[in-house]
Amino acid sequence: MRAPSMDRAAVARVGAVASASVCALVAGVVLAQYIFTLKRKTGRKTKIIEMMPEFQKSSVRIKNPTRVEEIICGLIKGGAAKLQIITDFDMTLSRFSYKGKRCPTCHNIIDNCKLVTDECRKKLLQLKEKYYAIEVDPVLTVEEKYPYMVEWYTKSHGLLVQQALPKAKLKEIVAESDVMLKEGYENFFDKLQQHSIPVFIFSAGIGDVLEEVIRQAGVYHPNVKVVSNFMDFDETGVLKGFKGELIHVFNKHDGALRNTEYFNQLKDNSNIILLGDSQGDLRMADGVANVEHILKIGYLNDRVDELLEKYMDSYDIVLVQDESLEVANSILQKIL
């Protein structure tokens, strides 16, 4: 007796199942080959940084991906309990430019305010034009630049003192400025606060202005410590000078060592994410005695062609003309 023949619909269903099975098998083979190839190349099944879309942008430059992968894996393994952030402020947490226009540093916020006379502003601009060129000169060494930075800061601070700026006007000065924090700053600060991660902002700018910027942005959380050049006001609230040792872009090593007590309180926080935008910022973690893993992220904002090689030699990750905190936030997302 002949078995009843299958109707066309049943045949189609069987064919579809068989076809899907073949596709799944082929896809599985392709995936296995991909993983095998990755494993053979890197010694592991996958690379975390290859799976993070933020790392695939053209602005992200990494000289040694294997080293960066190892550091990030160490940071992830250590988790929140071992992490601390050490970061510069001007042009690192704040924007270098927006829609083609330069954004102000903490010093520029004061320089550009309506309380500063036109004559003083002209002198401050002349100082900036002279000394900024020295600061970013790719040929001069840090040691050669050092005395010029002291000259620049000392002269500009002297001019500001002559303006008799009132402390009561700082809030208004910041509110009226064009300062902007980098895209993603809320996520950055809020996530670190939620997980009680210490944030050490080490700035050669003006501390009073810096604090007002992050206060007005709503991100001056209790886990944030600011070390910078703080204004000294007289009993009537008028600027009379600056407190303590001068911090400029190339003496952060000395400043870091002066803050050893702070870092000693965080002796269990042996994993560091460091963010900066200059060669001097690389020394900001010098006060940390027990570093286990440190990831150095550098923003290269200006003179890219001249400085890229030097930055890639010194920073683990270089972000070229990047006005966001996307990369840092993506790493924090993996750790926390």
Curated annotation (Swiss-Prot):
Reply yes or no: does the keyword tRNA-binding apply. no
**Gene Ontology biological process:** defense response to virus; nucleotide metabolic process; pyrimidine nucleoside metabolic process
Pfam families for the chain: UMPH-1
**Signal peptide segment:** none
Q: Which Gene3D superfamilies match?
A: HAD superfamily/HAD-like, Pyrimidine 5'-nucleotidase (UMPH-1), N-terminal domain
EC number per UniProt = 3.1.3.5, 3.1.3.91
Tell me what happens on changing E135D.
No effect on nucleotidase activity. Almost complete loss of phosphotransferase activity
Q: Which residues carry this modification: Phosphoserine?
A: S278
PANTHER family, per the entry = 5'-NUCLEOTIDASE (PTHR13045), CYTOSOLIC 5'-NUCLEOTIDASE 3A (PTHR13045:SF14)
Similarity remark: Belongs to the pyrimidine 5'-nucleotidase family.
- Record-given protein name: Cytosolic 5'-nucleotidase 3A
List the source organism: Homo sapiens
